[in-house]
């Protein structure tokens, strides 16, 4: 763009005009830099339950790991060793990338992120989570956040009192107690809107965050209508926060109420997969590749709308063998 033209008349005029020109050039450089954004495609779920990229509309598929350094025992263990947690995150994310992972999932320990009313706490756990997200973004690793666990932070040690709302309720009453539901609404609303200081983006606006799962392995004890009402209240709180990302729900627990899950507006469903079992108590021998050839879901042909939801395995582990080939 042709901005200006000037003719030198005196040394003073020349210096003045040169200064003005310099300011104009700097201004346009600054504006150009600030206005430049890297377009990162987001994820949407089509009418057939397939995750797709927003730019190419091709299917999006992911393989990754759970990793919990910001929370609970992993957090404490690094403290015992005197290890800088952010330095550990730097190294671990590097190795996750070397493994070829393009995805990361975590269930947040809400007991370490909230007060007794469900208000989000600005603390070291949240700061480390924000830092971890920023480092994952640098490696082009996409993220699914499971917002809450609704159990303590102790295992394999004793729980530590934190004042978090989940400590006030039994896990199986979390989804029916009015005060507990209100606390979860408050927490989800604040979490989704939380701005990560390392990225400058709210979780709801970060394209590297694929979506949110409402909770980890819920324990529903009520009727199907009560289960549906609970999920709809959580969805409403997340929408109110401005979220447009897909929301997932665990459908591999409480299978007797599975119809209620699919009768809500969740966009994705989550499952465990231990292809050769979990508790044999010994190392099993043999060729187990046929066990990962298929993943059969018992209610796949029984529930209306099953094929309209995306599917995510949040735990995959051939736990009773010592071989790596199952991956």
Kindly give the residue locations of the regions a language model identified.
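Solvent-exposed loop/turn segments connecting transmembrane beta-strands
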Residues: 322-324
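Bacterial N-terminal signal peptides
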Residues: 22-29
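Boundary at the C-terminal end of the N-terminal hydrophobic targeting segment
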Residues: 33-37
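Glycoside hydrolase catalytic-domain groove-lining segments
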Residues: 240, 244-320
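Active-site mouth of glycoside hydrolases
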Residues: 40-266
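Aromatic- and carboxylate-lined catalytic core of secreted/periplasmic carbohydrate-active enzymes
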Residues: 327
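Short, Lys/Arg-enriched N-terminal segments with co-localized hydrophobic residues
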Residues: 1-14
């Amino acid at each position: 763009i042709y901005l200006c033209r000037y003719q030198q008349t005196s040394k003073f005029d020349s210096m003045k005009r040169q200064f003005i020109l310099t300011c104009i050039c700097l201004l346009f450089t600054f504006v150009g830099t600030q206005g430049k954004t890297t377009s990162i495609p987001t994820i949407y779920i089509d009418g057939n339950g397939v995750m797709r990229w927003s730019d190419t509309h091709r299917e999006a598929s992911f393989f990754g790991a759970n990793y919990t350094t910001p929370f609970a025992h992993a957090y404490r263990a690094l403290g015992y060793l005197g290890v800088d947690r952010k330095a550990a995150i730097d190294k671990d994310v590097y190795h996750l990338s070397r493994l070829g992972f393009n995805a990361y999932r975590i269930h947040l320990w809400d007991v370490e992120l909230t007060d007794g009313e469900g208000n989000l706490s600005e603390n070291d756990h949240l700061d480390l989570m924000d830092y971890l997200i920023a480092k994952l973004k640098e490696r082009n690793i996409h993220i699914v956040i499971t917002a809450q666990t609704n159990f303590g932070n102790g295992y394999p040690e004793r729980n530590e009192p934190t004042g978090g709302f989940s400590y006030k309720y039994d896990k199986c009453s979390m989804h029916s107690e009015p005060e507990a539901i209100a606390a979860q609404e408050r927490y989800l609303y604040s979490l989704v809107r939380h701005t990560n200081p390392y990225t400058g983006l709210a979780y709801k606006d970060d394209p590297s965050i694929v979506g949110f799962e409402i909770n980890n392995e819920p324990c529903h004890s009520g009727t199907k209508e009560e289960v549906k009402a609970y999920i709809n209240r959580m969805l409403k709180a997340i929408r109110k926060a401005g979220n447009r990302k897909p929301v997932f729900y665990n459908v591999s627990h409480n299978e007797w109420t599975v119809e209620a899950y699919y009768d809500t507006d969740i966009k994705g469903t989550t499952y465990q997969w231990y292809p050769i079992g979990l508790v044999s108590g010994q190392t099993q021998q043999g060729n187990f590749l046929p066990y990962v050839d298929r993943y059969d879901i018992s209610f796949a042909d029984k529930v209306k709308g099953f094929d309209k939801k995306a599917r995510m395995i949040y735990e995959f582990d051939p736990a009773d063998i010592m071989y790596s080939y199952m991956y």
